[in-house]
Amino acid sequence: MVPDEQLLARFFIPTKRERYAEMIGHPKKRRKFLCELAHFRSLDPRYLIPMPPKKLFPDQIAEILTKKGAPRSCWITSENSELDGKEMPLLEALNEVVGRQMGTLLTCIPGRLAYFEGEDMGCRWILERRD
């Protein structure tokens, strides 16, 4: 299973998984899915951890993710077409994403640990499953 599919299976609300699975695998439909990330409401709230208010900079977010087991690199799913579908160092990816108001998911450990940033104010979460 590729990182995008694991995101769907593990962090999206069950009623949306099938629809997004179909979209994410087709180039034209994928673009529509990526545009929805800006104001995304389909993440399963059971696995969302809000970012602490004083931990809003890329290096601080990277530190939190690293303490939770994130490796040095991550997979990017983003409405920013220059980043989408790429793997890059975690801190570099966070520097490109944080504060840019582009819906983006960074997969650190597929199916277990990710980061989401949306366009709306305060829309920054760590996604974590420990099961």
Annotate each PLM feature.
Residues 1-123, 128-131:
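Structured alpha/beta or helical-core interaction and ligand-binding surfaces enriched in interleaved
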